[in-house]
């Protein structure tokens, strides 16, 4: 992986999140996990380059993100679609998903990411907020919450950008 600056990124994040999906990768004192995400955002907040990811409050990954200062967001080529599908449908509660997926753990400044990613954002968590159901303004959004499982938004400062060789 090669490090580049945020301004050198040439990637369509709309497709990256929504069409191609991505992984949020996190490690706490006990274990690590990778979870497929299809909702996210990139932008500037508080004069920092940030990425926002959304995790349902019932997901095993949530407590790990709550307890971690850093995480990574990894984007992959289409050939990894089956692995992302697996990582999005299985729970770390039951198995070591990264090992079972045969993806390779690597580190950048003690932050875990996956070697096979074509683009990795190393994130320092700077804010998190639960999204309350009673604040939904567009009622069409409620179809995503029929079982009441809301999301937590995790906003991270992009501290490093890595691209595949």
Specify the residue positions occupied by each region the protein language model found.
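Active-site-proximal mixed secondary-structure blocks
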Residues: 1-37, 41-165
